[in-house]
Curated annotation (Swiss-Prot):
Belongs to the antenna complex beta subunit family. Antenna complexes are light-harvesting systems, which transfer the excitation energy to the reaction centers. A bacteriochlorophyll binds at residues 21, 39. It holds the Pfam family LHC. Residues 2-27 are cytoplasmic. Residues 46-49 are periplasmic. It comes from Cereibacter sphaeroides (strain ATCC 17023 / DSM 158 / JCM 6121 / CCUG 31486 / LMG 2827 / NBRC 12203 / NCIMB 8253 / ATH 2.4.1.). This is Light-harvesting protein B-875 beta chain. It is found in: Cell inner membrane. The keyword Cell membrane applies. GO terms for molecular function: bacteriochlorophyll binding; electron transporter, transferring electrons within the cyclic electron transport pathway of photosynthesis activity; metal ion binding.
Length: 49
């Protein structure tokens, strides 16, 4: 277990916080890619301007 002085205000160690951040960013990139593909598909199907 991490010592109290090693924990940030979130209760995570620096290593855990970096791992959580990398997982979060991977999910954000995946969500963004799916959203872009969906918008392009809808625009090709029915342009909105």
């Amino acid at each position: 277990m991490a010592d109290k002085s090693d924990l940030g205000y979130t209760g995570l160690t620096d290593e855990q916080a970096q791992e959580l951040h990398s997982v979060y960013m991977s999910g954000l990139w995946l969500f963004s890619a799916v959203a872009i593909v969906a918008h392009l598909a809808v625009y090709i199907w029915r342009p909105w301007f």
